[in-house]
């Protein structure tokens, strides 16, 4: 018993190829050129997708996540307790920290007994997913709506942001405290 194997296409995209001779017009490729011109003309009248940055700024999504910032409380103390949940939740493993015990003369700097002596985010690894913000029980880290994610630079060391670049400036913390008290 002989079985014949037919050329069956599983995807449905298989086409039969013909080797027929081209006509004179087809050999001049006029039909293909006209089709290409029609596509070009169609795109010419569409709405432009490019903008003239920085004169025009594209509107960001309401769920946009920008630059990282470590929050301070109303008294200017850092919220971070170096629990490490942000580092554990980071899928890119971009966050590293070293915990330290607060000394008696540092009560005005840190809220809890334990604080992050070293807190670094490697911006070359960060994917701005926001999981660190969600994992933090003290609401110490958040992603701002700043449109400048990471300033350009040529040296890798400048992309590892330490507490000097991440901690919220004192004047902004005081403004936030005044806004909370006003509400």
UniProtKB/Swiss-Prot annotation:
The keyword Flavoprotein does not apply. NDH-1 is composed of 14 different subunits. Subunits NuoA, H, J, K, L, M, N constitute the membrane sector of the complex. The gene is nuoI. Disulfide bonds: none annotated. It comes from Flavobacterium psychrophilum (strain ATCC 49511 / DSM 21280 / CIP 103535 / JIP02/86). Keywords: 4Fe-4S, Cell inner membrane, Cell membrane, Iron, Iron-sulfur, Membrane, Metal-binding, NAD, Quinone, Repeat, Translocase, Ubiquinone. InterPro entries: 4Fe4S_Fe-S-bd, 4Fe4S_Fe_S_CS, NADH_quinone_OxRdtase_chainI. Pfam families: Fer4_7. GO terms for molecular function: 4 iron, 4 sulfur cluster binding; iron ion binding; NADH:ubiquinone reductase (non-electrogenic) activity; quinone binding. SUPFAM superfamilies: 4Fe-4S ferredoxins. Belongs to the complex I 23 kDa subunit family. Its EC number is 7.1.1.-. It is a peripheral membrane protein. [4Fe-4S] cluster 2 binds at residues 90, 126, 129, 132. It comes from the Bacteria. Its cofactor is [4Fe-4S] cluster. One of its GO terms (biological process) is aerobic respiration. Binds 2 [4Fe-4S] clusters per subunit. It is found in: Cell inner membrane. It is an enzyme of class 7 (translocase). This is NADH-quinone oxidoreductase subunit I. The keyword Hydrolase does not apply. It catalyses: a quinone + NADH + 5 H(+)(in) = a quinol + NAD(+) + 4 H(+)(out). NDH-1 shuttles electrons from NADH, via FMN and iron-sulfur (Fe-S) centers, to quinones in the respiratory chain. The immediate electron acceptor for the enzyme in this species is believed to be ubiquinone. Couples the redox reaction to proton translocation (for every two electrons transferred, four hydrogen ions are translocated across the cytoplasmic membrane), and thus conserves the redox energy in a proton gradient.
